[in-house]
Swiss-Prot record:
Organism of origin: Salmonella gallinarum (strain 287/91 / NCTC 13346)
Subcellular location: Cell inner membrane
Tagged with keyword Transmembrane: yes
Hydrolase as UniProt keyword: no
Membrane topology: Multi-pass membrane protein
GO MF terms, alphabetically ordered: transmembrane transporter activity
Pfam families: MFS_1 (PF07690)
Keywords: Cell inner membrane, Cell membrane, Membrane, Transmembrane, Transmembrane helix, Transport
Residues that span the membrane, as ranges: 8-28, 45-65, 75-95, 102-122, 131-151, 157-177, 204-224, 231-251, 274-294, 325-345, 349-369
Gene: ycaD
GO cellular component: plasma membrane
Major subcellular location class: membrane
Protein's UniProt name: Uncharacterized MFS-type transporter YcaD
């Protein structure tokens, strides 16, 4: 059976359109709030409400998938996200936008859980690495193209909202032409997120998602600030961020194939070691281009490989709950990482950004080295 089936390809096409919309809004919302003369702390609170929505959406989407299936859950998630987008046009204000971004955050998290769970349930232990690589390539490509759109079109609120909303609704269309079967509905026993988080054999995967959240959240959120403090102009900052994201895109497919062929544990060990090397190289500031490239190529692939590791340790009917637990772990890491790194940078030195990334990666590497090997016959093999 082909890895990239028709439902998988249509699902990824829809994700690409939705990710474009997410990238555009995540970039422009803080700018719109600043133009409305809201204080910085309120802009930060609006951003936090979006991530809080992510947490909430992650928690209940598994139940929703079990009740109404993948397709309808995807439609509902997209409509919630579209509502959060349309609502921004009503009134620019702190409480109003905090509410609408919370709603948008719920919708976005639901989309991620549905897409990731559908891919996990569509694949086997032999091809999940490639499926998740394709997922991350679509996600990062959408993010990259979204940034290009922001630089090419009008940034006025009432000019942007109509076509972004249209793009969200267009993201629903591909799934109208296929049906993704939810094999969980036949399972007698449902699994909870807390049970998945406590599962001993999947702990390396859960920890990997937390570490991935810390690393990527810190790079996304604080790398521009680090480069700004190095005296770079906005154009240069954009170039180096493009190098970072492009490396993440290019590293997805080969890493996914290697993980399927040689095992996730070995690939995770190599990836984490490369992240440490890239972080140390950034401290020297001698060769920023190769340092950023290897940091992006290895760091951006941690999440899908760790996810594939955890998902092969559970029964097939537990995959949705496990995916919720992993996305929740990643979200927690992406909230904690930038906050802690920003505090270190403000009080001590900007270089502590990379020291922190190297330190948490080293801790995870020790966890990986303690594991003697992989399960020879993964549980979720069908």
């Amino acid at each position: 059976m082909s890895t990239y089936t028709r439902p998988v390809m249509l699902l990824l096409c829809g994700l690409l359109l939705l990710t474009l919309a997410i990238a555009v809004l995540n970039t422009l919302v803080p700018l719109w709030l600043a133009q409305a003369n809201l204080p910085t702390w309120q802009v930060g609170m609006v951003s936090s409400s979006y991530f809080t929505g992510n947490l909430v959406g992650t928690l209940f989407t598994g139940y929703l998938i079990k009740r109404i299936g993948f397709n309808r859950s995807y439609y509902l998630a997209s409509l919630i996200f579209a509502a959060g987008c349309v609502g921004l046009g009503g009134m620019v204000g702190f409480w109003s936008w905090m509410s609408w971004r919370f709603i948008a955050g719920i919708g976005c998290a639901m989309i991620w859980v549905v897409v990731e769970s559908a891919l996990m349930c569509s694949g086997t232990s032999h091809n999940r690495g490639r499926l998740l690589a394709a997922y991350m390539m679509a996600y990062y490509m959408g993010t990259f193209l979204g940034q290009l759109l922001v630089s090419k079109v009008s940034g006025e609120l009432l000019h942007v909202l109509p076509w972004v909303t249209g793009m969200i609704l267009a993201g629903i269309l591909p799934l109208l032409f296929t049906r993704i079967v939810n094999q969980q509905t036949q399972a007698r026993h449902s699994s909870s997120i807390s049970a998945m988080l406590k599962l001993r054999q999947a702990r390396l995967g859960v920890n990997g998602c937390i570490i991935s959240g810390i690393v990527l959240g810190s790079l996304y959120g604080l790398m521009p600030l680090y480069l700004k403090h190095q005296g770079m102009a906005n154009a240069s900052i954009g170039f180096w961020m493009a190098v970072l994201v492009s490396a993440g895109i290019l590293g997805q497919w080969p890493m996914g194939r290697l993980a399927d062929k040689f095992g996730r544990l070995l690939v995770l060990r190599v990836q984490v070691f490369v992240v440490i090397l890239g972080s140390i190289a950034m401290l020297t500031q001698a060769a920023m281009a190769p340092a950023l490239f290897i940091l992006g190529a290895a760091g951006f692939k941690l999440y899908p490989v760790a996810m594939a590791w955890a998902c092969e340790k559970v029964e097939h009917h537990q995959l949705v709950a496990m995916n919720q637990a992993l996305l929740l772990s990643y979200t927690v890491g992406s909230l904690l990482g930038p906050s802690f790194a920003a505090m270190l940078m403000q009080n001590y030195s900007d270089n502590l950004l990379f020291i922190m990334i190297a330190s948490v990666s080293f801790i995870y590497l020790l966890m990986l080295l303690r594991n003697a090997g992989q399960t020879p016959n993964p549980v979720a093999h069908i």
